[in-house]
Amino acid sequence: MPGPPFLCGETVDLHTVVEADAEFIARGRNDPEVRPWLPRSRPHTVSEAREDVEGYMSDDSDGLGLLACVDGDPVGLVSMFMVEADSGRAFIGAWFVPEAQGEGYGTDAVGRLVGYGFDERRLNRIGAAARADNDASRATLEKLGFVQEGRHREHYYVESEYVGQITYGLLESEWRVD
């Protein structure tokens, strides 16, 4: 069972992670339909997921990991990482289990995290990246106003081939335009 809600969206709530969430995180990251989209070629163990959870729960980290939940059940994870408070910038990432994909949860969850970053963390810039062939992730970022800033050719090695990466950025002033 996830921790209490931290941010509430229209379709998903973003809950704090607790130790018991490590199994969901490992299972989700290893799912055959999720894993190819993540920058990792080997299994993600429950032990590694526990370390991730400890990092999310730590007071020493400026980063943040939250479970995206629908009716209290976890359907994915959104995170803010590489936070540089002095420079006002961070990166975000997200993944969702297959049965939750295509329902708008990603747009709602990532949008809530972006709003939190700009409103409460006083960030000026949020970056993100997606595989060049990940149309769903790219559409989510673009729908939220992220601007394509670069392309890294043959950045990932996935399923016996190299695939590019698209990098995105969103400035606080661009977020406020809406």
PLM feature segments, named:
Residues 33-55:
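Conserved GNAT-fold acetyl-CoA-binding loop/helix
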Residues 41-42, 65, 157:
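Sparse recognition of residues in long alpha-helices and their boundaries
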